């Protein structure tokens, strides 16, 4: 996954400077200089700075982390967790939408259906996957996959990472709102367990369309909201530069959403975010997903469906 060079966010400048100093000293050490002790001291300082920084992230900073280009994406989780993955394409009505990846495979030996939004990691793949913003055919593909999973009694895993559904004219003409609604309804009608994991951005109805699940898990520095901070800023203040203020007011972090009962569990990220150790993050996600499915296993179809429906009905009632 990801490119060879680490990309730093603006607020990570102190860590970037320390890492740069470490690289310089390692170059000197390679030429014969005995400075290993000094390198170790700076490495310890950099690790502490990183830990302190990420322990006090603001909602806006978490939004930046959630969007980090080197953060593991849907296809990385599929590659790391799903054996024998067989992707399926098309909605059988219009065409295929690669913003939404879906198919069947084995998760720790058990057959499973996987659907998720893929943003892409290079210019070519970002364009091909439309930056993770699905069109109507993407959500109709998700419905097709969920109906197949239900028919064959297979649990469904959703990997959520989207800024939102694609708002283009063509998408609207093909029934974007209806497709999102039907995908959300398909989640609710499943008689098999479904687990959703928000791995980056959970943007509005585009995320909810595949995240209406029995268990909703969320990474520590992911965000989940009805609208992006930039869009909220433009609407509320008529000023797109107030995104930071909007993010602070919107309660979009995993920590806030757990308090509100919108999500069920927060998954700890490696020090400095998932992008600094994708393999460890994917392993942690695998354990949490397995535990969630184990908790739901053996429950009857009617019970699974009723509990899921009640879970989402209770969110508004508990916040009222």
UniProtKB/Swiss-Prot annotation:
Superkingdom to which the source organism belongs: Bacteria
Keyword S-adenosyl-L-methionine recorded: no
Metabolic or biological pathway, per its Swiss-Prot or TrEMBL entry: Lipid metabolism; malonyl-CoA biosynthesis; malonyl-CoA from acetyl-CoA: step 1/1
Annotated EC: 2.1.3.15
GO biological process: fatty acid biosynthetic process; malonyl-CoA biosynthetic process
Subcellular location: Cytoplasm
Domain CoA carboxyltransferase C-terminal positions: 41-295
Primary enzyme class: transferase
Pfam families listed in its UniProt record: ACCA (PF03255)
Keywords on record: ATP-binding, Cytoplasm, Fatty acid biosynthesis, Fatty acid metabolism, Lipid biosynthesis, Lipid metabolism, Nucleotide-binding, Transferase
Cellular component GO terms held in the UniProt record: acetyl-CoA carboxylase complex
Chief subcellular location: cytoplasm
InterPro entries, sorted: Acetyl_CoA_COase_a_su, ClpP/crotonase-like_dom_sf, COA_CT_C
Annotated catalysed reactions: N(6)-carboxybiotinyl-L-lysyl-[protein] + acetyl-CoA = N(6)-biotinyl-L-lysyl-[protein] + malonyl-CoA
MF terms in GO: acetyl-CoA carboxylase activity; ATP binding; carboxyl- or carbamoyltransferase activity
Family: Belongs to the AccA family.
Function: Component of the acetyl coenzyme A carboxylase (ACC) complex. First, biotin carboxylase catalyzes the carboxylation of biotin on its carrier protein (BCCP) and then the CO(2) group is transferred by the carboxyltransferase to acetyl-CoA to form malonyl-CoA.
Assembly, per entry: Acetyl-CoA carboxylase is a heterohexamer composed of biotin carboxyl carrier protein (AccB), biotin carboxylase (AccC) and two subunits each of ACCase subunit alpha (AccA) and ACCase subunit beta (AccD).
Listed name of the protein: Acetyl-coenzyme A carboxylase carboxyl transferase subunit alpha
Organism: Rhodopseudomonas palustris (strain ATCC BAA-98 / CGA009)
Gene label: accA
